[in-house]
Amino acid sequence: MMTESEFIRASEALFEHIEDQIDENGWDFDCRFAGNVLTIEAGDGTQIIVNRHTPNQELWIAAKSGGYHFAEQNGKWLATRDSRDFYDVLNEALSAASGEAVEIEEL
């Protein structure tokens, strides 16, 4: 398990990476980071929320498809419920919101 400061640094790097990937690829999303929350809004107003839950060292995604909790396991963020990869879930949510294929590369 990471220390709290390591978790915060890792999650901030991940949030920055997501924003950079969206900007570099020109996908139609607005990103806002405030506190522990990265809000990604599609052109039609659909939101995908990515946040960190520091006490449990989890990343959470909230999207139309549902809510997901991810814990770090061997260098990957995997869903606590079904072991789905963070990037798979995020890319599916972003693709559904934008109506085009979105592929955020792993950090």
UniProtKB/Swiss-Prot annotation:
Domain of life: Bacteria
Molecular function in Gene Ontology: ferric iron binding
PROSITE patterns: FRATAXIN_1, FRATAXIN_2
Record SMART domains: Frataxin_Cyay (SM01219)
Protein's UniProt keywords contain tRNA-binding: no
SUPFAM superfamilies: Frataxin/Nqo15-like (SSF55387)
Gene Ontology terms: biological process: iron-sulfur cluster assembly
Keyword annotations from UniProtKB, A to Z: Iron, Metal-binding
Main function: Involved in iron-sulfur (Fe-S) cluster assembly. May act as a regulator of Fe-S biogenesis.
Family of the protein in this entry: Belongs to the frataxin family.
Protein name (Swiss-Prot/TrEMBL): Iron-sulfur cluster assembly protein CyaY
Gene coding for it: cyaY
